[in-house]
């Protein structure tokens, strides 16, 4: 580890690992020491830093061996120790400091440990939060946010609370935290805090700047920019192709060096290059090419090492950390002053710089051939050398620094490697009570408490593979339980107590504090916001490449296993818990899976072992728990040292009250897994962060992730994401790329998350979205830019908190997602909210692009969307909103000049629609407008071209000419850097002749200059037609949220993105990349939560209110959008009005609607809910918009997914002509060329109209994304089991199409379509409702349903005893006598578990989990798409919840009859997925149904697998021969095993069956073609169990009850021997003896189950017995006490009726025993139990 020294593990057989980064004995370590020249600021332009800080001061500061304790402010104390401190004196100092703090502050302080974890720190202080990260490094953005939130929450909880920052090593860590908190607290900007902020600034400049690292300053710059909105979020993944070193460092005696790169994403290695041998005089630079491009998203660390020639050590040449959210150029340059280590190293040339060349796709960049190295540079690809493979960070914090097993030698030297983690804890030595074996339970259990303090997320070696698999843990992972927090509904903000400043005062304060930190520093990446100066061939200046060419979502990024030509570093601990492992480290068990961790490395709030009082596995957390500070939620992954998780973010309160935690991190939002466990009352801030593993994680490419939130939030999450896997070298680059993308998709399938999940994050964060082209923070704002006034109003603390939340969400979005459990938050964990799981921040990219989730309207048709009523709906836009000029009835199909493609769903706005003026483009804001009842036409406005920045905000002036609008919206597209010519070329490629005149700037290989010709605005590119294949793909996969991993090749995607013409470039502003919206959080009008709420409100307090209070203002932008998008509140509109979603073009045609940045192909058909193609969007010239029949809009509003458009020019599939379908042609088949049978068409489905559920069309385009629509199938199909355990509420009406949106759907019925979506649904779900259901029994533990013990929830498998009087004999006909009748408290149908997650893969499986893709027509395609042939070796496709892209193979036009008649209207999984039924029950359900009927259940024989039972027309011949006689109806139900693996789910034993990302995908594919099944599956449109119940006659109801049985908890009182007595006398006698007995018997709670087999008693606590069974034939009588005596309960809850049954004494044929019980649950009265027993006895022929 670049962090500590080697530990001698005396207690274990392990030998110390070699530390390859130690300098050779005689070598001086110039690079490791902060030398005097440190005074040179990383950015020469930071004039405010005084040059007076001399070298001697710097050296003295760093070399000082004294403890340094400074009161930065009265309530923030910094305690710093030099890294060279001797252990003995260090321990002594620790004790002294602890004594001083206790004497002065008592227990009112929290110690934030920013260094390695230590046992003594945990023991000496009452409250410790571990946020450590490696010395001299910078923490993940999300960790910075977590720390700030934790500090703010604690400081605001009470006036006497104090924060202590503990650091051992370089002061840079303190500086990052202090500077970040200064910016964070500046948001609230109260006058009484000005002095504190000034003090923080002073501390930072005096103590930290001289010794800090450039990357640390860069991250502070990111954080402040994201908070203020000055940095626009780029939430797209980037593919790194080249790393060019200009200038050769002299690390060899004769000059030159032997460099090799290691790239880390979220502190996990994702790439290791070969070793380049460069002679000092050979040339002036080296180009390290990564082929195919390496997908990067989130927090990136690139470390360049020099491999010594004859010594087995390596030197660090330079190190640089950056976050992709702030990279707005495809070519960025870091000068020497920006490179960690190198900036003070004389061996690195002064003029040296490092250039990174990115693109939006993995394919080779055309025109970069000149970057090849000369013949004198040789490359050694032998990366098996441990020196090269060694990961310096894998063991960070695995063990405590002061662990008794060994001592730390030279703790200060980075590069020391900790001993590999032992397989067990050390018992008493390490503070544990007992030594515990750490099981590598990659399949199912979690590691238990041991894990809590150990596998740091970052250490999880297999992250790469892990990420890939969306493995479906069939329920073992409990991670989401604790880790996820759902959105906070928003607690009332506590008064802040600070005077709010007026804008003038605020400006004054700003002037006072100006110059702090990096505000004045130039942006750390060299992309200047303004026109970029031409690049100089050499020199320290950076190349400014402002052109922001990325269109969100353009390249189908799937974070999948990526392959580099050189294998990735080996991932050592292949343990199921590693971050990568998507399995969830179950938090209950103490481990979290990365997924639930939300992909954030959790800051380990108390890493369960850091708090002193308690077993080592608990942090002070226990104490805090005891003190009520926070819930005992084991820190999952608590040991992740470099955890990106916010503490706050990471903790998801388990409590249902989301709103209690004002500072809940974005994770809550994102990851919002609604899983909160009710009982805790602890404040969120103290909860151990749950690493949401990549929940929200990284939606990588997830469609929903693209949100424009402030990078901060998103970035954080991403940081934790697992990186794409490096595939084996054997596969081709294209395949690797494809795999990588798929993996992305899988991961992305969340948040959100995030982040992510979310995970991804859905585009919630308002903060980033301000659209105004804002100059980069460091540059003055161009006068013309319409940026929001700096402080339009003083935001309240709640708003600030909220904005932070939004940021968090954003971070999540960016974080690389791990899909596994991450995307699967367990079923709704909150009782009051159906939890939609993040699909992975998470969210999975629905379409494989980063599409922006469009908010979904989840409204039963009787309600209108509640947009208008949402307080947030009022546009808080920085600039004046454009009047809603045509918001009423006239359809507006104006073609906007710059045509950023927006999803054209516009419904007509109703008068006064309120839109978010500044809605982040990232969220496809649906316009909240409603159409008047009379004009229910679907307006489709032609989407503006993708080039327009995705700004949702219109310029200040009212409706200006389109020209002006586009001008203001578009910033000049100045491309500089290696990529410039490429972009320009691409643009010209698809432009009309006029457009092609835009000259491209090219850089000549020789001089690194760009030849730049002035760009001319081009005319809008003609609309790209959506290819029918895409449509068919969507149609075919309604439930699986099919992602089209490759709708078009990356090249096409890239070209498409860039083809957007730079229309109207203004010379003044910088072109903001689409999707990068810049809205200061404060402008959103969000109501932040007050941190005090966390501490003050008991957790259960507001539980029921979340869904109920429709008046409460949305807590967060996300929430407001969700509310707006869903019709959760009835009454906002006249009941029958259709909901109108208007997606106005940005130019203001619909001024008041939300602008939806997502591009929608102008001609691509939108399919109406009823399945008919409404008609394609009008082509550019089409004068009329398509009109949807009113009923389609009103009743079914958009359920069908939008089709993702494919670039026409290069796509290999045929595109349909732009002509629009007229409304009258709704029924006409829309045949897809891919399906000869026309399967792609949608047949109108008459039933569809009756579906009240409405989901917005699932096409989400990321704002700015090139015209490709990112489509999410908006069917209400729950995410596949692999993804979220979906809350299955039968009533759920719609699934939010993308996680970002529905995350907070308020509608009580909306089942999250994809886990990440409804992640935070607010509807309250009663514990008995199906929302609690889990996919498999194992999953029931921690989350809501897992909380069965706490909530009293009974597993759905055994109904409670019916209490309806009509049910019992002697009363009227038992209507509801069937076991699942409504009389049962559990409710029917059985709660639908969220589909199960895939199990975590075992270590062995993980390493083989790289799917390969074959290519068709030069495009990568999955085996499915290439003709369904069996996957080539090892090429199983890992679809994340989506089906293969059928658009790959082009077929002649097809006849309509084969068109897939798949219904998009409703989620059908609740009908066919019955996890808890037995094989026999499945046969009974199916044997009388038509062939093709099927049920999928959890396999009882194979853990983690599923059983598919399907009815066939005739049994196999072998069965016919064997059973020539008798009834063969049971044989007509055939059974297949669906196995889960890292690649997904597939039918076992069928070689030509592909792997599917989820059960939904498997089901929908087999409903289209049988593949290996006997016939096609017929997707049911109603619940077979309901049908069976309807058909059953009342006469056999007793039989049905017998089969299923009933159960409940009762009090067992006593057993009295009766000899041969039975009947009422026996009961009476037993009661009499019991009541007079002395002492009175103690009542014990037992589970009382009655079935056809008899009565079974289970003592849950095993006090008296474990289980007793009384066969039915031994039970002779059962009744209430004839004398109606009562039992007095000890809990004082009142008397309870007594009842009993008489059974034969075991081993006797004559003697009886009377067993007495008292009723326990008022809902299960004794009379109901007795009646049921009697009924069962009657059914078996016995008498009472």
Curated annotation (Swiss-Prot):
Q: Tell whether Phosphoprotein is among the UniProt keywords.
A: yes
Q: Which Pfam families match?
A: PTB (PF08416), PTEN_C2 (PF10409), SH2 (PF00017)
Q: Which SMART domains match?
A: PTB, PTEN_C2, PTPc_motif, SH2
Domain SH2 span(s) in chain numbering = 1472-1581
> What is the enzyme's main class?
hydrolase
Q: Where is the composition biased (Basic and acidic residues)?
A: 1004-1014, 1041-1054
Return the Gene3D superfamilies for the record: 2.60.40.1110, Pleckstrin-homology domain (PH domain)/Phosphotyrosine-binding domain (PTB), Protein tyrosine phosphatase superfamily, SH2 domain
Cited InterPro entries: C2_domain_sf, PH-like_dom_sf, Prot-tyrosine_phosphatase-like, PTB, PTB/PI_dom, SH2, SH2_dom_sf, Tensin-like_SH2
List residues of the PTB domain: 1607-1743
List keywords of the entry alphabetically.
Actin-binding, Cell junction, Cytoplasm, Cytoskeleton, Hydrolase, Phosphoprotein, Protein phosphatase, SH2 domain
Q: Tell me the tissue specificity.
A: Heart, gizzard, lung and skeletal muscle.
Question: One GO MF term, please?
Answer: actin binding
- Residue ranges of every copy of the C2 tensin-type domain listed in the record: 235-361
- Low complexity: compositionally biased ranges: 580-589, 763-773, 1156-1169, 1208-1220, 1421-1435
Compositional bias segments (type: Pro residues): 774-783
Q: What is its EC number?
A: 3.1.3.-
Single GO cellular component term: cytoskeleton
What's the subunit arrangement here? Binds to actin filaments. Interacts with phosphotyrosine-containing proteins.
The UniProt entry's sequence similarity note says:
Belongs to the PTEN phosphatase protein family.
The function of this protein is: May act as a protein phosphatase and/or a lipid phosphatase. Involved in fibrillar adhesion formation. Plays a role in cell polarization and migration. May be involved in cartilage development and in linking signal transduction pathways to the cytoskeleton.
Q: What name appears for this protein in its UniProt entry? A: Tensin-1
Instruction: Name its species.
Output: Gallus gallus
Q: Which gene encodes it?
A: TNS1
């Amino acid at each position: 580890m670049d962090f500590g020294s080697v530990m001698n593990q005396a207690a274990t057989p392990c030998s110390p690992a070699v530390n390859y980064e130690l300098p050779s004995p005689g070598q001086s370590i110039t690079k490791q020491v902060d030398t005097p020249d440190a005074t040179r600021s990383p950015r020469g332009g930071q004039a405010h830093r005084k040059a007076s800080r001399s070298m001697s001061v710097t050296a003295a500061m760093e070399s000082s061996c004294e403890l340094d304790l400074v009161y930065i402010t009265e309530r923030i104390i910094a305690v710093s120790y030099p890294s060279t401190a001797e252990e003995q004196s260090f321990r002594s100092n620790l004790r002294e400091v602890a004594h001083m703090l206790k004497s002065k502050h008592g227990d009112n302080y929290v110690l934030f440990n920013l260094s390695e974890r230590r046992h003594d720190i945990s023991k000496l202080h009452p409250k410790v939060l571990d946020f450590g990260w490696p010395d001299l490094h910078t923490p993940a953005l999300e960790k910075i946010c977590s720390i700030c939130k934790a500090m703010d929450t604690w400081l605001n909880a009470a006036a006497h609370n104090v924060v202590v920052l503990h650091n051992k090593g370089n002061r840079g860590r303190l500086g990052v935290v202090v500077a970040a908190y200064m910016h964070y607290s500046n948001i609230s900007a109260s006058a009484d805090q000005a002095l504190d902020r000034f003090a923080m600034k002073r501390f930072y400049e005096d103590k930290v700047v001289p010794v800090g690292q450039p990357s640390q300053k860069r991250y502070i710059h990111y954080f402040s920019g994201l908070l203020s909105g000055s940095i626009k979020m780029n939430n797209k993944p980037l593919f790194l192709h080249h790393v060019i070193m200009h200038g050769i460092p002299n690390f060899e005696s004769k000059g030159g060096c032997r460099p090799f790169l290691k790239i880390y994403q979220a502190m996990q290695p994702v790439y290791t290059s070969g070793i380049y041998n460069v002679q000092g005089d050979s040339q002036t630079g080296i180009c390290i090419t990564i082929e195919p491009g390496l997908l990067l998203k989130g927090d990136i660390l690139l470390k360049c090492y020099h491999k010594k020639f004859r010594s087995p050590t390596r030197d660090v040449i330079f190190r640089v950390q950056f976050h992709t959210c702030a990279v707005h150029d495809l070519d960025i340059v870091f000068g020497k002053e920006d490179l960690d280590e190198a900036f003070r190293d004389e061996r690195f040339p002064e003029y040296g710089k490092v250039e990174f060349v990115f693109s939006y796709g993995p394919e080779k960049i055309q025109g970069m051939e000149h970057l090849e190295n000369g013949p004198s540079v040789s490359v050694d690809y032998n990366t098996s050398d441990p020196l090269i493979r060694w990961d310096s960070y894998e063991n960070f914090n695995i063990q405590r620094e002061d662990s008794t097993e060994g001592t730390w030698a030279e703790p200060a030297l980075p590069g020391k490697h900790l001993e590999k983690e032992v397989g067990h804890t050390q018992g008493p030595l390490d503070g544990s009570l007992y030594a515990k074996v750490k099981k590598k339970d990659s399949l199912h259990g979690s590691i238990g408490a041991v894990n809590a303090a150990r596998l740091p997320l970052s250490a999880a070696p297999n992250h790469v593979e892990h990420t890939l698999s969306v493995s479906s843990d069939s329920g073992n992972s409990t991670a989401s339980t604790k880790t996820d927090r759902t959105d906070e509904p928003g607690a009332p903000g506590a008064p802040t107590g600070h005077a709010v400043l007026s804008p003038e005062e605020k400006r004054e304060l700003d002037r006072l504090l100006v110059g702090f930190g990096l505000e004045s520093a130039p942006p750390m990446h060299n992309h200047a916001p303004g026109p970029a100066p031409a690049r100089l061939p050499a020199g320290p200046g950076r190349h400014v490449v402002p052109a922001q060419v990325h269109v969100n979502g353009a390249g189908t990024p799937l974070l999948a296993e990526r392959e580099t030509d050189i294998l990735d570093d080996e991932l050592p601990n292949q343990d199921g818990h590693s971050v990568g492992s998507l399995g969830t480290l179950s938090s209950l068990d103490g481990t979290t899976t990365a997924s639930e961790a939300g992909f954030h490395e959790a800051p380990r709030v108390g890493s369960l072992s850091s708090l002193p009082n308690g077993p080592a596995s608990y942090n002070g957390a226990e104490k805090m728990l005891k003190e009520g500070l926070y819930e005992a939620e084991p820190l999952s992954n608590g040991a992740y040292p470099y955890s990106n998780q916010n503490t706050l973010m990471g903790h998801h309160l388990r409590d249902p009250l989301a709103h209690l935690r004002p500072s809940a991190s974005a994770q809550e939002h994102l990851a919002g897994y609604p899983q909160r466990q009710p009982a805790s009352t602890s404040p969120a801030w103290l909860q151990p962060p749950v690493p949401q593993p990549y929940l929200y994680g990284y939606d990588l490419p997830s469609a929903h992730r693209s949100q424009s939130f402030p990078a901060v939030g998103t970035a954080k999450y991403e940081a934790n994401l697992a990186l794409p896997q490096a595939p084996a070298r054997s596969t081709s680059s294209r395949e690797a790329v494809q795999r990588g993308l798929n993996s992305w998709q899988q991961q992305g399938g969340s948040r959100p998350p995030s982040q992510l999940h979310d995970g991804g994050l859905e585009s919630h964060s308002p903060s980033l979205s301000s659209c105004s082209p804002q100059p980069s923070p460091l540059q003055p704002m161009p006068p013309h830019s319409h940026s929001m006034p700096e402080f339009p109003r003083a935001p309240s603390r709640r708003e600030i908190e909220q904005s932070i939340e939004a940021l968090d969400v954003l971070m999540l979005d960016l974080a690389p997602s791990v899909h596994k459990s991450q995307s699967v938050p367990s079923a709704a964990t909150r009782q009051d909210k159906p939890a939609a799981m993040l699909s992975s921040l998470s969210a999975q990219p629905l379409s494989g692009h980063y599409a922006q989730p469009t908010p979904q309207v989840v409204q039963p048709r009787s309600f209108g969307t509640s947009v208008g009523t949402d307080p947030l709906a009022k546009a808080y836009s920085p600039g004046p909103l454009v009047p809603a000029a045509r918001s009423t009835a006239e359809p507006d199909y104006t073609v906007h000049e710059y045509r950023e493609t927006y999803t054209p769903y516009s419904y007509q706005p109703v008068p006064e629609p309120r839109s978010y003026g500044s809605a982040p483009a990232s969220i496809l804001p649906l316009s909240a407008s409603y159409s008047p009842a009379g004009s229910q036409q679907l307006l489709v406005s032609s989407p503006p071209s993708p080039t327009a920045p995705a700004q949702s905000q219109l310029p200040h002036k009212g409706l200006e000419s389109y020209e002006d609008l586009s001008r203001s919206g578009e910033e000049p597209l100045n491309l500089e850097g290696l990529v410039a010519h490429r972009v320009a070329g691409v643009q010209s490629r698809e432009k009309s002749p006029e457009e092609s005149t835009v000259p491209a700037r090219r850089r000549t290989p020789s001089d690194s200059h760009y030849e730049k010709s002035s760009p001319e605005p081009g005319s809008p590119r003609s609309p790209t037609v959506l290819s029918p294949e895409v449509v068919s793909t969507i149609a075919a996969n309604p439930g699986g949220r099919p992602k089209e991993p490759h709708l078009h090749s990356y090249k096409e995607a890239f070209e498409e993105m860039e083809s957007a013409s730079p229309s109207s470039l203004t010379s003044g502003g910088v072109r903001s990349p689409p999707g990068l919206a810049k809205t200061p959080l404060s402008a959103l009008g969000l109501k932040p939560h007050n941190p005090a709420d966390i501490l003050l409100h008991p957790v259960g307090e507001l539980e029921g209110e979340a869904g109920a209070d429709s008046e409460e203002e949305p807590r967060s932008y996300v929430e407001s959008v969700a509310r707006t998008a869903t019709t959760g509140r009835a009454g906002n509109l006249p009941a029958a009005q259709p909901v109108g979603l208007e997606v106005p073009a940005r130019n203001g045609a619909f001024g008041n609607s939300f602008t939806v940045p997502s591009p929608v192909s102008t001609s691509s058909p939108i399919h109406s809910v009823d399945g008919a193609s409404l008609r394609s969007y009008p082509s550019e010239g089409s004068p009329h918009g398509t009109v949807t029949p009113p009923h389609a809009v009103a009743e079914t509003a958009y359920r069908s997914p939008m089709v993702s458009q494919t670039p026409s020019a290069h796509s290999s599939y045929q595109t349909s002509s732009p002509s629009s379908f007229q409304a009258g042609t709704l029924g006409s088949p829309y045949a897809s060329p891919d399906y000869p049978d026309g399967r792609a068409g949608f047949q109108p489905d008459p039933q569809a109209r009756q579906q009240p559920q409405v989901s917005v069309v699932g096409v989400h385009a990321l704002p700015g994304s090139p015209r490709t629509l990112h489509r999410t199938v908006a069917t209400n199909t729950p995410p596949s089991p692999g993804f979220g355990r979906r809350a299955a509420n039968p009533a759920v009406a719609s699934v939010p199409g993308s996680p970002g949106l529905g995350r907070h759907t308020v509608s009580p019925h909306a089942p999250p379509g994809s886990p990440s979506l409804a992640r935070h649904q607010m509807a309250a779900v009663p514990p008995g409702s199906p929302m609690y259901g889990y996919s498999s029994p194992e999953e029931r533990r921690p989350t809501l349903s897992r909380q069965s013990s706490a909530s009293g929830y009974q597993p759905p498998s055994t109904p409670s005893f019916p209490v309806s009087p009509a049910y019992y004999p002697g009363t009227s006909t038992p209507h509801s006598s069937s076991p699942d009748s409504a009389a049962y408290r559990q409710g029917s149908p059985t709660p639908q578990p969220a589909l199960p997650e895939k199990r975590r893969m075992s270590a062995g499986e993980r390493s083989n989990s790289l799917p390969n893709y074959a290519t068709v027509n030069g495009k990568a395609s999955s085996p499915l798409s290439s003709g369904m042939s069996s996957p080539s070796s090892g090429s199983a496709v890992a679809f994340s919840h989506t089906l293969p892209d059928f658009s790959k193979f082009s077929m002649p036009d097809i006849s309509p009859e084969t068109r897939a008649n798949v219904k998009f209207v409703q989620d059908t999984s609740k009908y066919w997925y019955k996890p808890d039924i037995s094989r026999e029950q499945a046969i009974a359900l199916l044997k009388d149904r038509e062939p093709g009927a099927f049920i999928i259940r959890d396999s009882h024989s194979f853990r983690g697998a599923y059983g598919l039972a399907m009815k066939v027309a005739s049994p196999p011949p072998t069965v016919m021969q064997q059973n020539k006689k008798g009834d063969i109806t049971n044989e007509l139900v055939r059974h297949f095993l669906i196995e889960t693996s890292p690649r997904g789910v597939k039918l076992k034993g069928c070689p030509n069956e592909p792997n599917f990302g989820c059960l939904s995908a498997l089901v929908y594919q087999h409903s289209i073609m049988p593949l290996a099944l006997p016939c096609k599956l017929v997707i049911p449109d109603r619940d077979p169990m309901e049908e069976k119940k309807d058909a059953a006659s009342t006469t056999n109801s007793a039989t049905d009850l017998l089969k299923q049985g009933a159960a409940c908890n009762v009090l067992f009182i006593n057993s009295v021997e009766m000899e041969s007595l039975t009947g009422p006398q026996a009961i009476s006698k037993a009661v009499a003896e019991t009541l007079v007995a002395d002492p009175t018997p103690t009542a014990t709670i037992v589970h009382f189950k009655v079935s056809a087999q008899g009565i079974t008693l289970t003592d849950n606590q095993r006090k008296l017995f474990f289980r007793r069974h009384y066969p039915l034939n031994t039970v002779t009588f059962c009744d209430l006490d004839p004398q109606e005596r009562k039992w007095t309960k000890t809990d004082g809850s009142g008397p309870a009726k007594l009842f009993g049954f008489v059974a034969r004494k075991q081993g006797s044929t004559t003697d009886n025993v009377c067993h007495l019980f008292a009723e326990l649950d008022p809902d299960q009265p004794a009379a109901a139990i007795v009646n049921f027993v009697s009924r069962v006895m009657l059914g078996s022929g016995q008498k009472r």
